[in-house]
């Protein structure tokens, strides 16, 4: 099969994995940079809102408007043959929302490249942005790494730090870090694919972890939290899980 050289100089077809709203930042960045996105893998349409209306992920809508094939497997092995039909594909993953099995990882060269919004090995897990705000860190950042079976434990291609001024909200920081990560990915992808940029293993002894958030995380106990701690949670949990506090007989949504 012949390869098409794009304006980016990259010929390997890209399979993009992503589901969340901010996954669209990365997909759009790849497409607008002229990179050869051959397919988008996302979760099946899901019921959302009070009316439980079946809603497509934003990346699916975007891909369809740009004539990019969309794959929505319930299990990734369902698309193995589709991936194998591509000529030496590379994977890019941004908040797909499912664990990628080893057999799927092995279908890609040099693997699946992941954009993670923290300075790994700090904050491995699903809530690094919220954790940085809640803990009132003075900096965070973004990492592009090679995906492995263990959560966020793969070797690192590049990182970019980002200073925090203790005013950031969750939605703002999501947009900022995933835009930063997308720009980093686009700029470094040629060097990654050529082998010029080699990943460096993480120091597992320095790893810290963050958990999946639940609605209960938004409950503010104003008798134990300092004003600064409460304010940080309000900024970190804006949108979901949203913060609430009980004052007297009233529960206030903040």
Where are these regions (language model features)?
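Short acidic-hydrophobic, aromatic-tinged amphipathic segments that line or gate anion-handling sites
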Residues: 70-75
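Short amphipathic alpha-helix with an adjacent loop that forms part of the alpha/beta core around
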Residues: 77-87, 106
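N-terminal Rossmann-like dinucleotide-binding module
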Residues: 2-50
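Short, well-ordered alpha-helical microsegments
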Residues: 23-25, 79-80, 100-102
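Donor/substrate-binding cores of folate-linked one-carbon enzymes
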Residues: 12-13, 33-36, 90-209
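N-terminal beta-loop-helix "entrance" segment that forms/cooperates
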Residues: 46-64
């Amino acid at each position: 099969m012949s390869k098409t050289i794009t304006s980016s100089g990259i010929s390997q077809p890209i399979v993009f994995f992503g589901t969340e709203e901010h996954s669209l930042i990365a997909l759009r960045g790849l497409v607008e940079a002229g990179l050869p996105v051959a397919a988008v893998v996302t979760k099946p349409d899901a019921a959302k809102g009070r009316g439980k209306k079946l809603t497509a992920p934003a990346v699916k809508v975007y891909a369809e408007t740009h004539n990019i094939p969309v794959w929505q497997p319930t299990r990734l092995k369902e698309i193995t043959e589709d991936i194998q039909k591509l000529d030496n594909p590379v994977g890019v993953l941004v908040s797909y929302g499912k664990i990628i099995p080893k057999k799927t990882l092995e279908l890609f060269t040099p693997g699946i490249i992941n954009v993670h919004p923290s300075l790994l090995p700090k904050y491995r897990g699903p809530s690094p942005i919220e954790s940085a705000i809640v803990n009132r860190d003075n900096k965070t950042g973004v990492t592009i790494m090679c995906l492995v079976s263990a959560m966020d434990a793969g070797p690192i291609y590049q990182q970019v730090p980002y200073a925090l001024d203790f005013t950031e909200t969750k939605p703002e920081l999501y947009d900022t870090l995933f835009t930063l990560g997308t720009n980093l990915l686009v700029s470094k992808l040629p060097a990654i694919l050529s082998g010029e940029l080699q990943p460096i293993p993480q120091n597992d002894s320095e790893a810290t972890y963050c958990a999946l958030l639940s609605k209960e995380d938004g409950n503010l106990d104003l008798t134990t939290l300092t004003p600064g701690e409460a304010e940080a949670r309000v900024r970190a949990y804006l949108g979901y899980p949203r913060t609430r506090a009980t004052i007297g007989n009233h529960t206030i949504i903040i």
